[in-house]
UniProtKB/Swiss-Prot annotation:
Source organism (scientific name): Acidiphilium cryptum (strain JF-5)
UniProt lineage: Bacteria, Pseudomonadati, Pseudomonadota, Alphaproteobacteria, Acetobacterales
Keyword Nucleotide-binding recorded: no
UniProt xrefs under SUPFAM superfamilies: L28p-like
Protein name in the entry: Large ribosomal subunit protein bL31
Keywords: Ribonucleoprotein, Ribosomal protein, RNA-binding, rRNA-binding
Protein biosynthesis among keywords: no
Record-linked HAMAP family: Ribosomal_bL31_1
Gene: rpmE
Pfam family, one: Ribosomal_L31
Complex formation: Part of the 50S ribosomal subunit.
Family to which the UniProt record says this protein belongs: Belongs to the bacterial ribosomal protein bL31 family. Type A subfamily.
GO BP field: translation
Amino acid sequence: MKADIHPDYHEINIIMTDGTEYKTRSCYGKPGDTLRLDIDPKSHPAWTGQQRVLDTGGQVAKFNKRFAGIGARKK
């Protein structure tokens, strides 16, 4: 393999939505950085069966505003 072409693989801290913390190895950030999850297997609708709107930064509102005029017309 070629030398010095691979990213640095180091230990980081993961904090899940319920506050659980664990260490893993990743190329994310710098050694010792913390990755705080917005959604994880304990809170994801695909695994919990619950529907919820995840509007990060107003993306849903932005979409609705942009496409408000498009849709089926009422008769």
